[in-house]
């Protein structure tokens, strides 16, 4: 799958990022998201595959494109036999976030990316559109920390695993009312807290790399983004655990959420027998082959955002493969048709 789809999915996230970046700093998060979705879908439909969106922009009633269950790729066309040989057909599940951090783009802030993860059919959990408690940590702490441990214990384990003091650690937490106690506990343990308004896929990813200055992600965010984070961290050999959160009193979202029993019933109808299960990243992204790709829209810990110049644009993309055990950083110059850039600089 890596050999067949690696370059294609790079182009998918690149085009989504370029489209969204045109709206960076313009205060219009909806349009930034819309153009990213359109660009990503157009590129996906040019790939020789039969893909199914398992995590996307919502249900078919909620989203006209990249909705859950939508089929994408050349091999989904009515005339697919002209382009796809059945014996070579690649069937995959796709999790997408064409513009993670739409508000970040609208405000011109750091941390927004165009993201997708793919695996063979059935290889990614079809996470419901609810919340998830998350714990992301470096590879050195994998299997040692646990989402049920108090923050102080996990921080001590991470510090020991990285051969440093707790006071050296930085933990990313989403700036939400529900996290006030978590933030207090992290600070009392001696670690530093980096509060973010959006973009916890980017934060989880940063925790999986050495040298980013981020050592953990803790707290509650969206469940679909948790599956995408799990796919990336599984490829990296890093730690990720998640637990679905559906109690309105815990989430404190400020919007309507169904009663607990109603959500539990719906989860069981979708095949999730234990709604309170702790999911390991190998369960959230269980496929034999998992591929993750992200292109920076705005600058982040790992990648620079899209930069425009007279003859085109420049992007930085991260591609991680569980199959080839590789991490690639791809620096791409996109030249407009019929134009030559005035001059290429190394950085």
From Swiss-Prot:
Please state what class of enzyme this protein is. Answer: hydrolase
Q: Name one GO molecular function term.
A: fructose 1,6-bisphosphate 1-phosphatase activity
Which residues are recorded as binding Mn(2+) 1? 33, 57
Annotated keywords: Calvin cycle, Carbohydrate metabolism, Hydrolase, Manganese, Metal-binding
Catalytic activity of the protein: beta-D-fructose 1,6-bisphosphate + H2O = beta-D-fructose 6-phosphate + phosphate; D-sedoheptulose 1,7-bisphosphate + H2O = D-sedoheptulose 7-phosphate + phosphate
Could you say which protein family the record assigns here?
Belongs to the FBPase class 2 family.
- Which purpose does this protein serve, as stated in its record? Catalyzes the hydrolysis of fructose 1,6-bisphosphate (Fru 1,6-P2) and sedoheptulose 1,7-bisphosphate (Sed 1,7-P2) to fructose 6-phosphate and sedoheptulose 7-phosphate, respectively.
- What is the protein's given name? D-fructose 1,6-bisphosphatase class 2/sedoheptulose 1,7-bisphosphatase
